Amino acid sequence: MISSHPEIELAGFIEQTCLKPTATADDVRQMCWEAQRYRFAAVCVAPVYAPLAVELLHKQKPQVFTVVGFPLGLATAPCKLFEAQEAAARGVTGLEVMVNLGAIKSGHYNAIYEELGQIVDAVGCEVRAILELNLLDATERRHVAEVCLDVGVTALKTSAGWSGPVRPEDILGLRRILRNQLGIKVAGGIHTLNQALELLAAGANRLGTGRGVEILREQHALGKTA
């Protein structure tokens, strides 16, 4: 969590993202170039482009994340485990695993624990859990956050990007549950400097967006750099 004061260098909080279904290899190359140029914290790409991103960013500062069970989380646990192991073997820094929202809605939290636990135990890289925060009520958010605290993931990601942006107050509530034990990555609908600053002030650690360059340019144009 950071101060709401705008005079911070945002690049270290941004994970430049390219998960659109029409993404091409050239799109990924451009994104990785931007990530190096602007010193973003990481990139996040679809599994098919993970090897390319790893190759392009080898020994560079930006980390490489890819997704598992994306975007709905409805693959079987063995399928997700295989996908996770394959991605880890290709050298990514970390995985973002879409959880089964139906299991949450049904109160089957043991299934979430077992699915994530198998992946955490099987791979030697960082594992994050993707929720759709806007589709979960307060009780569901608390229960699934507690599962994630217990199972060994390193962070929660608020959305796969299809249920709309979250509000700063949502992040404040999630941060109260997690305290400082897990990271929070906000994704979906982050387009402006003010949005980025508000979410970070509320307790987010990372921002997943395809508009990182535009946000930094907005910051620099306003003279809001460190």
Swiss-Prot record:
SMART domains: DeoC. Pathway: Carbohydrate degradation; 2-deoxy-D-ribose 1-phosphate degradation; D-glyceraldehyde 3-phosphate and acetaldehyde from 2-deoxy-alpha-D-ribose 1-phosphate: step 2/2. It is found in: Cytoplasm. One of its GO terms (cellular component) is cytoplasm. NCBIfam families: deoC. PANTHER family: DEOXYRIBOSE-PHOSPHATE ALDOLASE. Belongs to the DeoC/FbaB aldolase family. DeoC type 1 subfamily. Catalyzes a reversible aldol reaction between acetaldehyde and D-glyceraldehyde 3-phosphate to generate 2-deoxy-D-ribose 5-phosphate. This is Deoxyribose-phosphate aldolase. It comes from Gloeobacter violaceus (strain ATCC 29082 / PCC 7421). The lineage of its organism: Bacteria, Bacillati, Cyanobacteriota, Cyanophyceae, Gloeobacterales. The gene is deoC.
